[in-house]
Amino acid sequence: MAAVVAVCGGLGRKKLTHLVTAAVSLTHPGTHTVLWRRGCSQQVSSNEDLPISMENPYKEPLKKCILCGKHVDYKNVQLLSQFVSPFTGCIYGRHITGLCGKKQKEITKAIKRAQIMGFMPVTYKDPAYLKDPKVCNIRYRE
């Protein structure tokens, strides 16, 4: 450093600062020098201030069909009965079961086949009882 000052003694302070900054940058590539006092310098790595890539923590995981990759058989009554309402005998829709379209069709066909073959009961109820029963009979004043 003393040699640089002796050689560049005729230069002004501003030019000397730029010369020292360039010399430090050449010796340590990938860093830049911040000069904030007369002879006091600090080297800062350029990678410290860059944003870090990470997954979105608020993103919901993708819902996957639980039967994809599984074989659906009309004789498997225990599996098929999970997709039929015990009160009405109606087959639950995709929005309730969470199945993909292909597996929902397979389940529907398997349930119909099992009902025709006699493996599963066919439940028909009076339309008056198709709605869910009310838990509390609360009468409001009119």
UniProtKB/Swiss-Prot annotation:
Pfam family, one: Ribosomal_S18
Location (main, coarse): mitochondrion
A molecular-function term among this protein's GO annotations: small ribosomal subunit rRNA binding
Compartment list: Mitochondrion
Cellular component terms per the entry's GO annotation: mitochondrial inner membrane; mitochondrial small ribosomal subunit; mitochondrion
GO biological process: mitochondrial translation; translation
Superkingdom of this protein's organism: Eukaryota
Keyword presence, Ribonucleoprotein: yes
Keyword Phosphoprotein listed: no
Keywords: Mitochondrion, Ribonucleoprotein, Ribosomal protein, Transit peptide
Family matches, as SUPFAM superfamilies: Ribosomal protein S18 (SSF46911)
Oligomer status and interactors: Component of the mitochondrial small ribosomal subunit (mt-SSU). Mature mammalian 55S mitochondrial ribosomes consist of a small (28S) and a large (39S) subunit. The 28S small subunit contains a 12S ribosomal RNA (12S mt-rRNA) and 30 different proteins. The 39S large subunit contains a 16S rRNA (16S mt-rRNA), a copy of mitochondrial valine transfer RNA (mt-tRNA(Val)), which plays an integral structural role, and 52 different proteins. bS18m has a zinc binding site.
Family named by the database record: Belongs to the bacterial ribosomal protein bS18 family.
Miscellaneous information on this protein: There are 3 mitochondrial isoforms of bS18 in mammalia, localizing to 3 distinct sites in the mitoribosome. bS18m (bs18c, this protein) binds to the same site as bacterial bS18, mS40 (bS18b) binds to a novel location of the 28S small subunit, and mL66 (bS18a) binds to the 39S large subunit.
UniProt protein name: Small ribosomal subunit protein bS18m
The species this protein was found in: Homo sapiens
Gene this chain is encoded by: MRPS18C
